[in-house]
Amino acid sequence: MKIKLILACALMVFSAASSAQRIKDIANVQGVRSNQLIGYGLVVGLPGTGEKTRYTEQTFKTMLKNFGINLPDNFRPKIKNVAVVAVSADMPAFIKPGQTLDVTVSSLGEAKSLRGGTLLQTFLKGVDGNVYAIAQGSMVVSGFSAEGLDGSKVIQNTPTVGRIPNGAIVERTVATPFSTGDHLTFNLRRADFSTAKRLADAINDLLGPGMARPLDAASVQVSAPRDVSQRVSFLATLENIEVEPASESAKVIVNSRTGTIVVGKDVRLLPAAVTHGGLTVTIAEATQVSQPNPLAGGDTVVTSDSTIDVSEADNRMFLFNPGTTLDELVRAVNLVGAAPSDVLAILEALKVAGALHGELIII
């Protein structure tokens, strides 16, 4: 497989980083973030695709008890249309009580499908244990499953996970430090000392010297007005200032599981000669049965016939001259017919030899 397409896409990604970008595209305001919510609930109304586990029965009995219906402790309800689920949602910053959230509903037990089910009222809690939203409603399930009496089964997508658009109502807000203090802090999404300095300089050019100062490679602190309305206008102006991020350091990123290789445009090679030969050993086993004539009194014998074939690829050596660029590397690799797995071995060897100018990252 040729790797030109992957490398060409990488060139576009790395070259795009050199153009000016708005602050809002490269940094976040510290403290302004979403919060994860989670809850435990029941889905009812399933067409026989629910579950009959002990904890499902216990949850079902607890729900009935909350409605004033008490069942004997030794009674086991026969329920096939109920499933226990985990309900999760992301709560954006500044969302207010009465607004709604999309929720994801995932089966916790052995339910075959959640299609056709309805989530009953479920409390969604934050990491502090407080309830921030309440979810309820009919689910949208994209997957489905069907099973025959002979055990045959058809499953498409994931029938045990569903979504409820606007399925949760926010009951409580999350406090943010946005409206407190004398400063705002921008956190870069990709930490870089040069970019942090450029961001601070761009703000100081607009507002005046000393208004912004970089704290480290990822954070820039800006003096801000105390009045909330002024702070909103202040931030609306700052987030649209354009900053040219520093170019990325030379990197080669390799996914050893998929064979994907991404090479940055600044990667260079020192003089090196590379040859990559492949030795292939193929062993084929065939089983033969010797069945004698019934009247001969012989025994049936099972024998194995092994065939071993050894072949070695006739690959050529290629030479990297000083300052070899990405394009030249791609042409050289394709010339010898190397697959992505072969390229990984070549890059690792070049890095060990000190001939690869760039960081080799294997994920």
Swiss-Prot record:
Q: Which residues form the signal peptide?
A: 1-20
Q: Which residues form a coiled coil?
A: none
- Fetch the Pfam families from UniProt: FlgI
* GO biological-process terms attached to the record: bacterial-type flagellum-dependent cell motility
Where on the tree of life does the source sit, at the highest rank?
Answer: Bacteria
Example of a GO MF term = structural molecule activity
**InterPro entries, sorted:** Flag_FlgI
Q: Where in the cell is it found?
A: Periplasm; Bacterial flagellum basal body
State any GO CC term: outer membrane-bounded periplasmic space
| Keywords (A to Z) from UniProt | Bacterial flagellum, Periplasm, Signal
Spell out the NCBIfam families in the cross-references: PRK05303.1
Describe, as the record does, how this protein assembles with itself and its partners: The basal body constitutes a major portion of the flagellar organelle and consists of four rings (L,P,S, and M) mounted on a central rod.
UniProt similarity note? Belongs to the FlgI family.
Q: Which purpose does this protein serve, as stated in its record? A: Assembles around the rod to form the L-ring and probably protects the motor/basal body from shearing forces during rotation.
By what name is this protein known?
Flagellar P-ring protein
